[in-house]
């Protein structure tokens, strides 16, 4: 029986893949965030454009991705900034109120419990379209998320 290059190309990845995927081989990257808790009352608050933003965490995951999480409260009619785009992806978790999330020109209304997601480099914007304050969490992952 002869072994061809094709056989070797198929054999070696299959043979060694399990060794590379063992949990002990996934060593956290230097400078990654440690496991922690983030009490609400200790979160710093910023107030750009009449929004109240609580910075929850910023840093690098053990797997290398940048991560940033904050909570925003918008007054009725408020928006944190104009529509924009960036390299990292974002997810919104709506807690209270009604927001309108616009992604690449398509708008959707989201209420409590709803989730919105925007892929890297998609243009997006969010505003409070309700009559009460709207509160939501933003989870940003990818290059530039923690800057």
What is the role of each PLM region?
Residues 4, 10-66, 146-147:
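A short, N-terminal "cap"/entry segment at the start of jelly-roll beta-barrel domains
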Residues 106-119:
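Short acidic-glycine-tyrosine-enriched beta hairpin
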Residues 70-85:
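Conserved short histidine dyad/triad with adjacent acidic residue
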Residues 87-89, 94-99:
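Glycine- and acidic-residue-biased ligand/ion/polar-headgroup-sensing regions
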Residues 53-55, 69-73, 91, 115-117:
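Conserved hydrophobic/aromatic beta-strand scaffold that supports enzyme active sites
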Residues 120-145:
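Ligand-binding loop in jelly-roll beta-barrel domains
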Residues 79-81, 100, 116, 120-125:
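Histidine-centered metal-chelating micro-motifs
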